[in-house]
């Protein structure tokens, strides 16, 4: 068993063309898992990711702030304690809408992300 405390996890800049701004950091929680990825993503005010999809399910667990998780059909506000299941292949985005926002994402290790928006 391994227990990780989020506040003790190293925060690093998360530069990626998937994001609409540069104020994004991440904290990899379980780097030695063979099957799962569990990472905290911290979005600065107004930063989100662009429309994308995954080839497996993704779970988001909101840990701070208020944000939005959106598909082509709807935008849902989310806040501390909300848990979101995004099915494989669903076009979506998530991020901050006016204040800093953080979530943990959990997905299958080695899964493929496809960016669907420039």
Model-derived features with residue positions:
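Short, charged/polar surface micro-motifs in flexible loops or helix N-caps
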Residues: 33-36, 43-47, 66, 109-112
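A short, N-terminal "cap"/entry segment at the start of jelly-roll beta-barrel domains
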Residues: 1-36, 115-118
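Short beta-strand His + acidic residue motifs that chelate non-heme Fe in jelly-roll/DSBH
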Residues: 49-51, 69-70, 91-98
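Conserved short histidine dyad/triad with adjacent acidic residue
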Residues: 23, 39-53, 88
């Amino acid at each position: 068993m391994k227990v990780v405390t989020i506040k003790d996890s190293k925060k690093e800049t998360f530069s990626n063309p998937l994001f609409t701004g540069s104020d994004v950091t991440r904290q990899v929680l379980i780097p030695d898992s063979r099957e799962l990825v569990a990472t905290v993503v911290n979005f600065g005010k107004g930063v989100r990711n662009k429309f994308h999809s995954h080839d497996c399910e993704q779970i988001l667990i909101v840990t701070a702030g208020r944000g939005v998780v959106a598909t082509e059909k709807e935008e849902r506000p989310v806040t501390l304690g909300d848990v979101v299941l995004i099915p494989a292949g669903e076009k979506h985005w998530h991020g901050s809408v006016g204040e800093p926002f953080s979530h943990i994402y959990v997905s299958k290790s080695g899964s493929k992300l496809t960016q669907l928006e420039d």
